[in-house]
Amino acid sequence: MKFVIVGRGILGSSLYHMLRKLGHDVVVVESGERRVFPSLIHSLLLKDKDIELARMSLDFYREFSVPMREFVSITLGKIGKDILNSWERAGVEIGETYVDWLKSNGIVARGGDRLVYVSKLISSVPFVRGKAKVDLLQEKVYLDGKELHADRYLVVAGPWNPCLLKVKSKSYYCWATLVASRMRELGNHFVYDYEKGFYSRPLLGLGTGIAIVGDGRVIESPPGRRIPVQEDEVLDRARERLGPLVPLYTAGEFCEGTPDMRPAYGPITDRVLYAGGLDGYGAEVGPGLAKLLVDFIVSGEKVQEYFLDRFSHVTNFTIGREPHEI
């Protein structure tokens, strides 16, 4: 079978490798407009079925030798016992203890968090550069005005999906700030602070006090616009916990959010299928969602919790906060 994949992000790259492994002919098209960050968070410290997607993603990264680096994480705030038990069932070693450098009790987790070097995954995928257009009535895809012939078209273009398919999702802008701190521990730990409302992740993991801080806040906007942000809104809260922080650089990118801020997949027509709504945690759930789409194509298997038709009665919605991590 021949597939055309529209979008070479985490989803498109994962689908490419999965379908090629099954022996299919696959062409990936990409406009090249999106920024590809070198590394992103992969965490198992999620909730409910998202943990299963994250486990599937982790298996994919290992199978296809995507580089990763594991870190200890510290979660601050009250976390329900049912969630803690689900983390342990996923293979994470957790324990509550006093963390001197944070001056607070926290849940210390080992085996749950890592940086995954998604740029290596994405750069491994050959692609044809150009702007795609989808004609749903004719079930055709055009690249710069020229029809692309395939048996199935998989549209996984992230924040451009609402424009291409009119799916019930929205484009939004999310951002985080690179900071310098006197706390060297920030450079080799993840911190999820649900009391102050921020997260922190290492930049490189060298223990130099250089980290990336954000809070999952979003601004709804079509992709490609220049969006001004107030970085001190999150940094002031982070300083209450971490002390002095010097902002070095703030960067962001456009993402795609669904009405419930969880991933979605399913058919738009018989030949045009969709996956998306990664909601800022695509490195965690992206390859897992790609696997669900492949399973649906091959066998018709559906996981209703993530299936696109759950939004069939949604008429209007507002994007929520990104799930970092629960």
Predicted features along the sequence, with ranges:
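Short hydrophobic core segments
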Residues: 4-6, 148-160, 290
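C-terminal catalytic lobe of FAD-dependent flavoproteins
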Residues: 245-326
